[in-house]
Amino acid sequence: MESKDQGAKNLNMENDHQKKEEKEEKPQDTIKREPVVAPTFEAGKNCAPRGGRRRFRVRQPIAHYRWDLMHRVGEPQGRMREENVQRFGEDMRQLMEKLRERQLSHSLRAVSTDPPHHDHHDEFCLMP
């Protein structure tokens, strides 16, 4: 009789132990299955900015800003811009021509046999 009572107690203890394990496993499974959601910060709810976050929002660049400025011809400001662009283009052409002339003159002087015209800064002479 005592052996039957001990066997019943052992079964009850094993069942209780299994139930406890199942209860412990269930919360872990639910934790594993839930997706991790980042906390959202709303302004005005006593949220202080964290160290890694920027305090001010950076302004995004306007796409095609230069193209937009160059092609606004309908308004009077746009016409002025177009005139400025044309004038700027002419100035650039003149500067490029001057630069080309100077580069050619230096390269031609190195090739030509004519004596230099009072430019002694680039000459080097070892004769006494």
Curated annotation (Swiss-Prot):
Localization: Nucleus; Cytoplasm
Phosphoserine found at: 105
Annotated region (Disordered), positions in chain: 1-55, 107-128
Tissue-wise expression: Expressed in the central nervous system. Expressed in Schwann cells from newborn sciatic nerve.
Bilayer-spanning residue ranges: none
Broad class of where this protein is predominantly found: nucleus
GO biological process: axon development; axon regeneration; negative regulation of neuron differentiation; negative regulation of protein ubiquitination; positive regulation of neuroblast proliferation; regulation of apoptotic process; regulation of cell cycle; signal transduction
Biased composition (Basic and acidic residues): 14-35, 115-128
CC terms in the record's Gene Ontology section: cytoplasm; nucleus
Post-translational modification: Phosphorylated. Phosphorylation of Ser-105 protects it from the proteasome.
PANTHER family: PROTEIN BEX1, PROTEIN BEX1-RELATED
Domain notes: The histidine cluster (His cluster) and Cys-125 mediate zinc-binding.
Functional note: Signaling adapter molecule involved in p75NTR/NGFR signaling. Plays a role in cell cycle progression and neuronal differentiation. Inhibits neuronal differentiation in response to nerve growth factor (NGF). May act as a link between the cell cycle and neurotrophic factor signaling, possibly by functioning as an upstream modulator of receptor signaling, coordinating biological responses to external signals with internal cellular states.
Protein name: Protein BEX1
